């Protein structure tokens, strides 16, 4: 007997009692396991190591951390379902090591700077700080501008919570969801304890922006027109992206995240309108996307075609 939807609901309810979970991701992990039950003709909690790795390989994960999180869900789920069905089985997921999981990471995708919306969501789920999650999300949505000033000088006053829009001095307007709105509010208010070197004292860093400074800093670099302030804030974002890349084992750049976001919007546009890629690029909607992602040339259509047509072949 394979796993059914009611059993998944029961497990999610039980699993959520003992830990904070992101239900959509946990459910997706379980649903993928159910798909492979039909392939291997057995319940997922009876999968062998080789079968589990084949399932994980189908995820095309860019980070071993993401696979470890999936495996953690299935490890607990396998215990729960085996107990429920009174089965004594060897829990493959208990023995799954980081080394084994690293073998099924999609290396080609990992090296690419272009990430899907699913990749971005998985990355965010592996980030502990609201600041880092907000930086990744905002870059993906097209917030940037010259020297990333739109991002680094962003504050809560720009967020229209009722209409779910973020407004910028540059005239840019970014629609957001309730979830992203809550994330931004959390990130603006977030404080951290951080050491700026191996021998440096741990300091509290805070600020009303995504940019944070030590609480005892002489300046918060808040002058939008001051070159040094802009540069310090820009370096702050680049340093955060470097640390995220190092921690998760992926390549993250501000340009790569913005290109990923633009491609995602282009793909949605083509799907929703039924137009070909080249036809869609010449629509008013595509022009607005180009401006949103700081492609302000009159040749924006040709620039987009040259950069992204390979993804629509």
What are these regions (language model features)?
Residues 168-223:
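Basic, alpha-helical nucleic-acid-contacting "clamp/cap" segments
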Residues 29-30, 120, 128-133, 234, ...:
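Short, leucine-enriched amphipathic alpha-helices that occur as contiguous helical runs
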Residues 117-145:
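Basic, Lys/Arg- and aromatic-enriched nucleic-acid-binding interface segment
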Residues 238-304, 309-313:
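Short, basic (Lys/Arg/His-rich) helix/loop patches that form interaction surfaces
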Residues 137-163:
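Short, charged phosphate-coordinating catalytic segments
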Residues 10-105:
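N-terminal core-binding DNA-recognition domain of tyrosine recombinases/integrases
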Residues 61, 122-127, 154-160:
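Solenoid-like repeat scaffolds
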Residues 102-120, 170-182:
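DNA breakage-rejoining catalytic core of tyrosine-based enzymes
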